[in-house]
């Protein structure tokens, strides 16, 4: 049997001790990772959720804290506004440099994320341990580096894992989690990840190290929880954000609605990220078996399962698996990590990619509105049938995001990607064309329906005598109910 190497996933140095020169991270591989993610982040912005976050930031800068949701006609007055720090940051970037400023911000954060991902495997011996886990994680992250608030969440997760892996002081996690609570809801999974890796080390560590490791992880978790409390207190409605995950996931109806959104659906084998995440999880689990570390094996399986349970959790799992896989694969194989000329070459390539990403972000085009009904909304605007509080327009969620970006607080949107529960339940009934779809339209007092052509609801409206298709524009049908004079 192979010798059993040290099992701890963190460096053995005391907190605050400088990392030895031979364990420091060469600038080449992290620069390459930064360049790859930066270039992916430089593509024109076509994300629907970003539009609402930017619109929210504009409201925060122009009018201050709004009373309730400022965009949805259906939202209750006490509706919370999550990710408000991120929304404000987007609006500031827009004021400074327009949409180019937002893209530059996205590129910079994506590049920093690439550096952090590679740093999570720093100091491991061999190419397999130091390169394979971060390389696979970067592949997983490619579709997710968009100007949504989850980008800041991924970055803060990386910082939290670096704090633990490099044995930084526990109080570092206070500002990390205080910020995290106000930028993205993945802070809850950050606590879960810290607990999982702490449990793995407790189970696998030699008896003499368990007590000291337990004290350190308890301090880190305490700092994280304290940071959550501080962040919750900074929200204008004290601690509302801390309880928001329970509001969203607490009831059966809420869970059913959430599962209707693509980002909360399980990841299947038809998706490329399924296999890349499975590869990373298998590497971590296989290394744990080789090292006879049941705790690390269990953590790898649980993290991989968490990521596959919902698309939005895939990046969280991938980032979390990097230090675990690097530790279990440490010393495997005879090929050394890149150094010398090879590392310098990787760094040069990465620097070129970063430069190309910055150039693309500045030059444009900045926005990609191909999936949105721009022309159809133009037609509705010409008829006076949109952005009017006296006209109820029912539409799909991503259309609501576009209306909020285009019209701001005058959007009077029916739904977006963060509606209240009652509206979300009704919206799912429309999307799935449940038998009560006509009652849903009645509850919304719908006068106009703007929906994708050939969707089940579009076909159902074609058979409904009280609805008339006015026109089809770029794949979207405009429907009007009886009595709407502007549609005649």
Per-range role (PLM):
Residues 116, 137-140, 152-167, 195-198, ...:
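Specific aromatic-rich, kink-prone transmembrane helix
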């Amino acid at each position: 049997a192979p010798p059993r190497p040290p099992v701890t996933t963190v460096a053995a140095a005391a907190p605050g001790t400088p990392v030895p020169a031979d364990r420091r991270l060469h600038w080449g591989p992290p620069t390459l990772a930064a360049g790859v993610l930066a270039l992916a982040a430089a593509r024109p912005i076509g994300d629907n959720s970003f539009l609402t976050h930017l619109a929210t930031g504009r409201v925060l800068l122009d009018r201050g804290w709004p009373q309730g949701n400022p965009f949805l006609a259906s939202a209750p007055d006490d509706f919370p506004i999550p990710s408000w720090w991120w929304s404000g940051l987007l609006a500031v970037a827009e004021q400074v440099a327009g949409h180019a400023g937002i893209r530059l911000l996205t590129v910079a954060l994506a590049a920093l994320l690439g550096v952090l991902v590679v740093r999570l495997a720093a100091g491991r011996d061999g190419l397999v341990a130091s390169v394979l886990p971060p390389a696979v994680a970067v592949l997983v992250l490619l579709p997710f580096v968009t100007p949504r608030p989850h980008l800041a969440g991924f970055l803060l997760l990386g910082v939290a894992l670096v704090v633990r892996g490099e044995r930084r002081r526990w109080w570092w996690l206070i500002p990390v989690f205080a910020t995290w609570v106000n930028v993205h809801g993945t802070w809850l999974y950050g606590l879960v990840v810290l607990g999982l890796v702490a449990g793995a080390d407790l189970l696998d560590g030699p008896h003499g190290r368990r007590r000291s490791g337990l004290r350190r992880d308890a301090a880190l978790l305490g700092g994280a929880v304290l940071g959550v409390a501080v962040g919750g207190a900074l929200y204008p409605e004290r601690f509302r954000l801390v309880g928001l995950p329970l509001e969203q996931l607490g009831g059966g109806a809420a869970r059913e609605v959430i599962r209707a959104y693509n980002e909360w659906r399980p990841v299947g084998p038809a998706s490329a990220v399924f296999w890349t995440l499975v590869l990373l999880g298998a590497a971590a689990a296989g290394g744990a078996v080789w090292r006879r570390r049941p705790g690390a094996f269990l953590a790898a399986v649980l993290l991989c399962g968490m990521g596959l349970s919902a698309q939005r959790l895939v990046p969280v799992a991938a980032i979390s698996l990097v230090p675990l896989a690097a530790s279990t694969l440490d010393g495997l194989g005879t090929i050394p990590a890149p150094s010398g000329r090879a590392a310098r070459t990787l760094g040069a390539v990465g620097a070129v990619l970063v430069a190309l990403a910055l150039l693309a972000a500045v030059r444009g085009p900045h926005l990609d509105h191909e999936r949105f009904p721009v022309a159809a909304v133009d037609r509705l605007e010409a008829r006076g049938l949109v952005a009017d509080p006296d006209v109820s327009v029912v539409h799909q969620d991503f259309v609501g995001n576009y209306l909020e970006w285009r019209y701001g607080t005058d959007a009077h949107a029916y739904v977006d990607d963060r509606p209240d529960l009652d509206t979300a339940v009704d919206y799912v009934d429309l999307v799935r064309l449940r038998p009560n779809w006509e009652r849903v339209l009645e509850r919304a007092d719908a006068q106009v329906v703007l929906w994708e052509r050939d969707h089940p609801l579009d076909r159902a409206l074609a058979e409904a005598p009280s609805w008339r298709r006015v026109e089809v524009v770029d794949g979207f049908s405009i429907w009007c109910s009886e009595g709407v004079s502007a549609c005649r």
